Amino acid sequence: MRRLIFIPLLILWAQAAVAASPTIVDGDYVAEAIARNAVVWDVRPAAAYAKGHIAGAISIGDAAKVLRDENTEDFIATDRIEKILGLAGLDPHREIIVYGSRGTWNAYFGLYTLQYFGGSNVRVYHDGIEDWTAAGRAISLEAAHLPPVALKLEINPTVTVTTKEMVARLNDPNVQIVDVRTSQEFIGEDIRAIRGGHIPGAINIPYEQNWIDPETPAKLARKQTTNNGGMSLKPAEDLKRLYSRLDPSKETIVYCQSGARSSETAGVLQQLGFTNVKVYDSSWLGYGNTLDAPANNVTFFNVGLFNSRLSALQDRVNQLEKELAEARAQKSQK
């Protein structure tokens, strides 16, 4: 009888904890946070920020580009990040709201960055600038600034794993792995490292599945829609069904190609009450390039096929240039 009583109480406690300390918030929450002097961080590129941002929001430019090495896509040296965040007045230990454009992973990367460096009072405004503008809230064109702060950042090991730690966790029944890449990446058809494939035991749930309409970016590209409303999150019950194969009490490691897309799913899982979520920061770029790390559906880049297609493309370019030159010559003779 005690066990029957204890389990529902545990579930209620977890639900209450999520409600009291959400990871993902709406515009009303952001407005209230601003009123109590929370920091608002706009992670979009500088050009987007300059066209209009939440009044008082600060910017360091495109956070994912500024804070990561362009080759490895891992974080740059911690002392450099200390200077960048410090000059912007971004202290991870303050209350911070992170936002970007609706649904994009960039805001979640900001969340993960702050958690990685010890932040525990950080939220994501998923619907971002579009929702804020639609609600008629204050927008500014003037850059906001906070007083600089001296930072000494330390990595929080509870929110991330290294490649070595990832390999050590393979076949651990208390660990579950989520691959948020496309299905083509997962099965090795789309190769973005030395080899394609996926980590053994991982289940594939592309991060776009968190949205009401995962096809929204493609529809925008095809001009089948004019807004990104479909990139709002699914209702909580739908998200719970999406991740019903997972145990919220187990260690859950999320990865993608470089730790960017996975940060969004990590944030969603935190919102759903998963208690031990980690982002594999180096993700497949690190794992796929570690050739002695076990992998499934392994494929390798076909250099011969690539060269053949490149040669065919060059032939086509040469033909078009020849046709263009002939057309110009004929035109000049008239």
Question: Where are the regions that the model predicts?
Answer:
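Bacterial N-terminal signal peptides
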Residues: I5-A16
